A protein has these predicted regions:
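Long amphipathic alpha-helical repeat/alpha-solenoid cores
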Residues: 1-148
């Protein structure tokens, strides 16, 4: 099995940046585990967990070479649960804004922190507020891209 740092290098994260990325992602992974009500001592975070996220992003249209850029800009993404967080976020953004996955990927490339949104929590509340107060869907997207 490939190690964490080697895996990060394989997706375009330099060895010099890998320590910082791994440190941030590990901290977020523990927070995510606790948030789900699980014991962080029983959870492990390594290359296999990262690979699930990377596979999802590439399936959604992020070029493999650009995944490293996303990870450097927003290391926490490596710790997000694909089924519980990323897939629902993509589905929500695609359906709400009538944008396909590739369009959302372009938004994410401009603002990687969009991946930190939770579809069922902060994303929905922000978007509903903006739309209820007269913003168009395009204005709501632009707001998210400028402020997150």
């Amino acid at each position: 099995m490939i190690g964490e740092y080697e895996y990060l290098e394989s997706i375009g994260v330099s060895r010099a940046q890998a320590l910082q990325v791994m440190s941030r992602a590990s901290a977020v992974f523990e927070q995510e585990v606790v948030r789900r009500g699980e014991d962080p001592r029983e959870a492990s975070f390594g290359a296999a967990e990262m690979e699930r996220v990377v596979r999802f992003l590439t399936e959604k249209g992020v070029d493999t070479k650009r995944v490293g850029f996303l990870v450097i800009k927003h290391p926490a993404v490596l710790a997000y649960d694909v089924e519980g967080r990323l897939r629902p976020l993509f589905a929500y953004m695609e359906s709400t804004f009538e944008r396909d996955a590739r369009m959302f990927v372009e938004d994410v490339m401009k603002r990687p922190s969009l991946l930190g949104l939770r579809a069922d929590e902060n994303a929905r509340r922000m978007v509903e507020y903006l739309l209820e107060n007269g913003s168009s869907k395009e204005e709501a997207v632009e707001y998210l891209l400028r402020t997150l």
